[in-house]
Structure formats: C-alpha cells, structure tokens
Regions:
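C-terminal lobe helix-coil module of Hanks-type protein kinase domains
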Residues: 1-41, 45
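Conserved helicase/translocase motor-coupling segment
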Residues: 50, 54-56
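Short cysteine-rich clusters marking metal-coordination/redox-active sites
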Residues: 56-60, 72-76
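Cys/His-rich microdomains that often coordinate metals
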Residues: 61-69, 79-82
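N-terminal beta-hairpin/loop module of FHA
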Residues: 82-124
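Asparagine-centered strand-capping/turn motif at beta-strand->loop junctions
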Residues: 134-138
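Short, solvent-exposed loop/linker segments at beta-strand-coil boundaries, enriched for Pro/Gly
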Residues: 140-142
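C-terminal boundary/linker segments immediately following FHA domains
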Residues: 144-179
C-alpha cells in the first residue's frame, strides 16, 4: 500500500543477477539461517557488476546493459547492440566496453578489492567516433595482445584500440576481449 511502491515499480528494470542476489539474501532459507546469506564481499562484487552495466543511451539517459546480448534502453526503448566485453580474471568481472566505462583497480588487479580507484577508461577516437579504445590512466604499463599475438606496451595516457586487441595483460591480472 505504497510502502514498497518504488521497489515494485523499478524491480523489472534491474538486471536479473541483482534481482537474484536480493532474492537469495531475503529468502526464507537465508533469513532462517538454513542457507548462508551473501557476504559483504559478495554484495561488493554484485554492485560493482551493476555499476559496470550502466551505460548512457543515445537518448541521453542511463540504462542497464544485458550481459551477452543486445539490450534495450529502459527509458526510450532503443536497441543497444551488444558491445565487446573485457572478461577480467576468468569471468569474475565482465566489463562492457562502451565509451565512458571506467576500469577500476578490482578489474585490473586480481588480488584487489579496491572498487573505487579508476585505472582506465573506454574512450572514442575524436577523429572517428566509431573507433573505441582503452586508455590507461594508471602508472602501470599494460601489455595489449594484438589479434596476431604480438604484445604492445600501453603506458599511462596511451590507448589500446578495442577491435585490434584480443587481451590485455595487466601486471597482476588478465582481461580477455570478447567481441
């Protein structure tokens, strides 16, 4: 009767993985102690994944991407084609490579739980906006593996074109680009 109106109204807009996590955490089994509840780390990873799935539609509004398939803007209904994805740490994080998306330390360092420090971003080529790249904002050197298997160093401020590489070797992690 109005108490949970926003929860009910917005529930369908959220990606399935976040809805599933709330159902798991608030299930009868979890609440009674028969099943373990998600840990703080589980929630942190889940909300990082949720943050990673937010993109800005051409209509100017934010929307969620659906993992592994085309998405539709929750505001205007426009189709958003499935972008390439940076699979970090064997699927721990699947980061859609969409202009404006940030790479955080937890994405590039498999031992880190730092979800706030930005170490890279997806940018558009100013001369050709259809070409996207990963800009290294960190002091670490990344090694971009090209489609033919060669390694190319990507230092601070440098950009690795998304469609020309198949992986990025971070000092303490690996990201595979899935197109």
């Amino acid at each position: 009767r109005g108490v949970h109106a926003n929860v009910v109204r917005f529930w369908p807009m959220y990606p399935k993985f976040i809805r599933d996590k709330f159902v798991e955490a608030l299930s009868k089994e979890a609440m009674s102690g028969k099943m373990p509840r998600p840990t703080d780390n589980d929630w942190q990873q889940c909300f990082t994944r949720l943050r990673d799935s937010i993109v800005t539609c051409a209509c100017g509004e934010e929307t969620f991407l659906t993992q592994g398939e085309d998405s539709f803007c929750i505001n205007c209904g426009r189709k958003i084609p499935k972008p390439p994805v940076l699979n970090c740490h064997s699927g721990k994080y699947d980061l859609p490579l969409f202009p404006g998306v940030k790479l955080y330390r937890c994405h590039v360092d498999k031992l880190s739980d730092d979800y706030t420090e930005v170490l890279g971003e997806v940018v558009r080529n100013p001369n050709n906006p259809g070409i996207w790249g990963l800009r290294n904002l960190s002091d670490m050197v990344w090694n971009a593996e090209t489609l033919d298997g060669e390694l190319r160093s990507v230092g601070k401020g440098q950009i690795a074109p998304v469609m020309q590489i198949k992986a990025i070797h971070f000092p303490n992690g690996l990201g595979i680009i899935e197109k």
